[in-house]
Design a protein with these regions (language model features):
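Conserved N-terminal phosphate-binding loop of PLP-dependent enzymes in the Aspartate aminotransferase
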Residues: 1-199
Length: 199
């Protein structure tokens, strides 16, 4: 299971939230709070099979390594993130903020009768310029609207709010406050209102 984009579901990512039991799991830089790092885990059965083939480490076909493998800064970042961010308490707060974010965005979308949607996965929320929200990669690609995406990013940046690049998405963090979410909601409402007024 690749948790690169689903780790925001909770302390154990979508794997724990949905009760999955994968043979392998990968986690990207979210496990280090954005510092370049990653981790993977294996089921006992798969780990035994991998360990039985230590001869593969002698060739370029297997093994784990690289300039970031065991890097002390990456390891320290992962430890801090595991201890202070990827916890039940932190996720309860971050998910509540994402709920608030979604409610504010949805209110603006509904007020203007726009064919948009907002999707949430734990502490992550993303505006989609289609309704209902896409449920597959193909549908997501077909619904992509680069002009609306660019407009929203620039309009919000001009109102002192930054969204995640390449998506109209926000990720709540332990540092995010209700005031931050409310500031976004006001800026989003103003930007969307200006877009609707311009026709």
């Amino acid at each position: 299971n690749d948790e690169t984009h689903t780790f925001s579901a909770g302390p154990g990512g979508a794997t724990a939230a949905w009760g999955l039991e994968p043979d392998a799991i990968t986690i990207g830089k979210a496990i280090g709070g954005g510092i370049p790092c990653g981790a993977y885990g294996l089921s006992a059965e798969l780990a035994e099979r991998v360990a039985a083939r230590d001869d593969l480490d002698l060739v370029d076909m297997g093994g784990v390594g690289g300039t970031l493998a065991g890097n002390p800064v990456s390891v320290a970042a992962m430890r801090a993130t595991l201890e202070h961010v990827l916890t039940e308490d932190a996720f309860a707060r971050m998910t509540a903020l994402a709920d608030r974010f979604v409610a504010g965005v949805r209110a603006t979308i509904d007020r203007h009768g726009l064919p948009w949607s907002i999707v949430q996965l734990g502490a992550r929320a993303e505006v989609r310029f289609t309704s209902p929200a896409p449920t597959s990669g193909g549908a997501s690609a077909a619904a992509h609207d680069p002009e609306l995406d660019d407009y929203l990013h620039v309009a919000l940046a001009n109102r002192d709010v930054l969204l995640t690049p390449f998506h109209a998405m926000a990720l709540m963090s332990p540092a995010t406050t209700e005031a931050d979410v409310d500031r976004h909601d006001a800026a989003f409402a103003d930007a969307v209102g200006a877009l609707v007024a311009a026709g």
